[in-house]
């Protein structure tokens, strides 16, 4: 069973994403801020991180950068209500696996999760 960390400072969004993933049979942990997320990433093995761009203390891009420095093979889906092309470009430069704009289509989200986890398994 794949283990996924959901990071979003919007508690409702975090719960919705977590519930969707749990219904899909995944083991899910949640984090509501970047510092907590980084601690969890260092202490646990996650197959995938679902990471919001805009967090309270530190940006999702900073979390992405630090997480990938710790675990270069980590797979990350970044989500954002801000469809700014420069944010997406920077996330891709840092190594994000996928980037979804909020609100996102649930089928598209679930498919992105499955595709990324399947690629990780096949490597």
Indicate residue ranges for each PLM-predicted region.
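Acidic catalytic/metal-coordinating carboxylates
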Residues: 33, 59-62
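C-terminal output helix
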Residues: 86, 104-113
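The feature encodes the CheY-like receiver
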Residues: 14, 56, 84
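Alpha4 helix (beta4-alpha4-beta5 surface) of REC/receiver domains from two-component response regulators
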Residues: 62, 83-98
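Short amphipathic alpha-helix used as the core "switch/output" element in two-component signaling
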Residues: 39, 61-72
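Two-component/phosphorelay signaling modules centered on CheY-like receiver
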Residues: 11-29, 94
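Active-site beta3 strand of CheY-like receiver
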Residues: 45-50, 55
């Amino acid at each position: 069973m794949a283990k996924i960390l959901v990071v979003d400072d919007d508690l409702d969004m975090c719960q919705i994403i977590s519930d969707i993933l749990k219904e899909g049979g995944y083991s899910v942990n949640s984090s509501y801020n970047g510092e907590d997320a980084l601690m969890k990433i260092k202490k646990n093995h996650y197959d995938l991180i679902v990471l919001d761009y805009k967090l309270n203390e530190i940006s999702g891009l900073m979390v992405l950068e630090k997480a990938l420095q710790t675990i270069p093979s980590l797979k990350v889906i970044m989500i954002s209500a801000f469809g700014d092309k420069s944010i997406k470009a920077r996330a891709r430069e840092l190594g994000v696996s996928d980037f979804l704009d909020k609100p996102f289509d649930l089928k598209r989200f679930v498919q992105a999760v499955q595709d990324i986890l399947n690629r990780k398994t096949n490597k």
